[in-house]
């Protein structure tokens, strides 16, 4: 059993105290429960899976220190798997502890947006999705939380607008630019080829496993493009 082997690794190979071993095992068990609930193989979880887990847990954990310790536990588990050849690559390698509330710049110049768009690798399967995300975030002025929960049934491409539910459950109609319509249509073709999970049937933006993108995932996408663009 993987948990028993992990315990032995922590105790015998890492030489950790009994309390530290139990703390790391509790972190593993928390991750394992999340993976089981979302039909994910904990051993072969992806970066997206782990990022979603951290985002989910961060809603319950207020202390950055506590969250940092949990993430350290995740790193430890996947280093163990890598060391013992259960996996070929550590999916937790890029998971970072948020130092402050996740935030995206409210205002970007047209030039900056163009520079971000130029960083999208169009050979990747997620390229159309990521382009559509940028166009809707900055072209239509959506909040990340609004984009996360955007439903297909509230998008009217032919009419050129979408119905957005914002803070306090208030709804508003938001125009969609012709460019955003074009890229979202491309993304829809890609999305239709995915195995969409039942809970994400009406969700506009999903990952390659057909699961709803989280706020953390979208922030990560945008931040990586912004960093690559030197913003």
Language model segments and positions:
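Conserved catalytic core of the tyrosine transesterase superfamily
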Residues: 1-231
């Amino acid at each position: 059993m993987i948990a028993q082997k992990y315990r032995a690794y922590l105790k015998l190979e890492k030489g950790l105290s009994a309390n530290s071993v139990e703390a790391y095992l509790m972190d593993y068990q928390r991750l394992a429960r999340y993976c089981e609930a979302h039909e994910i193989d904990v051993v072969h979880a992806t970066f997206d899976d782990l990022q979603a887990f951290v985002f989910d847990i961060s809603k319950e954990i207020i202390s950055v220190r506590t969250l940092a310790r949990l993430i350290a536990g995740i790193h430890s588990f996947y280093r163990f798997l890598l060391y013992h050849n259960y996996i070929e690559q550590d999916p937790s390698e890029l998971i970072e502890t948020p130092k402050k509330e996740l935030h995206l710049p409210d205002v970007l110049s047209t030039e900056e947006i163009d520079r971000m768009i130029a960083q999208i690798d169009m050979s990747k399967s997620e390229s159309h999705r990521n382009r559509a995300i940028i166009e809707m975030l900055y072209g239509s002025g959506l909040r990340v939380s609004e984009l996360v929960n955007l439903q297909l049934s509230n998008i009217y491409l032919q009419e050129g607008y979408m119905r957005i539910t914002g803070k306090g459950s208030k709804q508003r109609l938001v125009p969609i630019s012709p460019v955003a319509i074009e890229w979202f249509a491309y993304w829809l073709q890609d999305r239709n080829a995915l195995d969409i999970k039942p809970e994400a049937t009406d969700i506009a933006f999903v990952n390659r496993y057909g699961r709803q993108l989280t706020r953390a995932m979208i922030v990560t996408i945008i931040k990586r493009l912004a960093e690559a663009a030197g913003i």
